[in-house]
Amino acid sequence: VVDGFGRTLAFHRAAKGDVAGAVTGVTDGAGRRFHLALTTQAQRAEAFRKQRASSLSSPASPRSVSSSQVFPDTLPAGTEYGADNGIRLEAVWLTHDPAYPDEQPTAPLARYTYTAGGELRAVYDRSGTQVRGFAYDAEHAGRMVAHHYAGRPESRYRYDDTG
């Protein structure tokens, strides 16, 4: 892709695996390469189960299981716009910068977390600081009810009966 200023963006797609066909890399006009780390709903569910099992083995952790601790292997069926394949962007990594070839970051430029329903929960910067947060209606999948930027007041949304 070439923009109006003559700068190019080249997109790279996964050839195989759980995210085959998805864009997993970008090279910009300056020659910088970025890796887009993608996850599937099943991978996020497995990570959740491992984290939960680890925390349950700790003597200090609570033993009760709430409905918020359920993380399904697949997303709920049916969205208004078609099936959701469950693939989500987990992190963006700078993997090559010609201006600094020996100084690549040891952390992602951005990291993203999701709810059990696949909705974006939080965005983190390269220092690991949460910079955005989102909340959703428990009874209406995907309906955002609040969001906030770090250090700023939360914005909340209310919906009438028609949505």
Locations of regions flagged by a protein language model:
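Extended charged/polar low-complexity repeat regions
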Residues: 1-163
